[in-house]
Amino acid sequence: IKHINDQFIAHFLEAVRAKQGQQFYAVGEYWKNDKDSLDKYLSEVKYKIDLFDVPLHYHFFQASQKGRDYDLQELFNDTLVNDHPDLAVTFVDNHDSQKNSSLESQVKDWFKPLAYGLILLRKDGYPCIFYGDYYSIKRKQSPHRPILDILLDARKKYAHGEQLDYFDHPNTIGFTRKGDEAHPHSGLALLISNGEDGDKI
């Protein structure tokens, strides 16, 4: 949508929602790894559209490339979901990030379960799973589907209530969800690590 006039988008969505109701959902892809540009766009369209959190995707990409040399405490720095949690569509990979594409930035396989855990089980953002990660790419069955099914089930049953973050170590971070009365037995803890050391008490 970065090549479409932003005022047109704002007026178009106003017109559609006047007919279809204010809950009519819209999301745009503005592929730029610069949160300030995305902030400006959201302001120009009067916050009428959600955006894919491209900066978060690039954090995941860098984390998967650097391994233990990436500071996990910085994963959500300068991301849409950090500043606009209700307008951010969080994702790990998509068709644009695949190998040999013009925007190649594919998250390595080892980090994908960690990244999906972070977007599916946290309270902020609107998580989106890449078709290729759940089903297949080039008719080859995805190895990620079993863990995604577990995470989706955990999201449905347990990812409710207040969230407490423990982003206090460069190689080991985590968070808890306290659960709520509307979802009996809900609540969870997620811990991720990209190195050998680190602990949470």
Question: Which residues are covered by each model-predicted region?
Answer:
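Active-site-proximal helices and loops of the catalytic beta/alpha 8
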Residues: K2-I201
